[in-house]
């Protein structure tokens, strides 16, 4: 069985383990695509890895084993997660980048959180955490076991948070649904990921 591994942030480890695989690297920039194709050809691995210059949101869902998204900017991370879920990915490794979308929605701050958000830097970090907490919770509601880790030291990049998901197919706990609904109601936000996976969320939480 061939492992299908789209890298949504752009194999060697799995290849050294003798595991047949196909890798798809997605990056909107044609320059990145052309450079990576040349590198793959130089390394002699072009038969098992391909690169595309496309928007993540425009990629057709396909059967996938592992999805990796590295520093896809703002809602491009949500595009990557949504694509992975709709492609039935079994493992997710998501390292988000900037979080502008939810930050722009934080206008009616619930008390006493204005004590935090009145400071621009702290509001930015709060929106980062809120965005990724909601992403993780949405994945839980869709049958993934999720944890959030630091995948590299802060001296290399401040964007060192990773959301890891393993698909279990478990039905969402009623308390998890309640917590999610309470969180978006309290902050008066509409997560981009929830909009992209609206049908899946309705099906999962009302079944």
Regions found by a protein language model. Name each.
Residues 19-27:
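Conserved SAM-binding motif I beta-strand of class I
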Residues 3-19:
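Conserved SAM-binding loop of SAM-dependent methyltransferases across substrates and taxa
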Residues 1-4, 98-100:
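Short glycine-enriched loops at secondary-structure junctions
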Residues 28-207:
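Class I S-adenosyl-L-methionine
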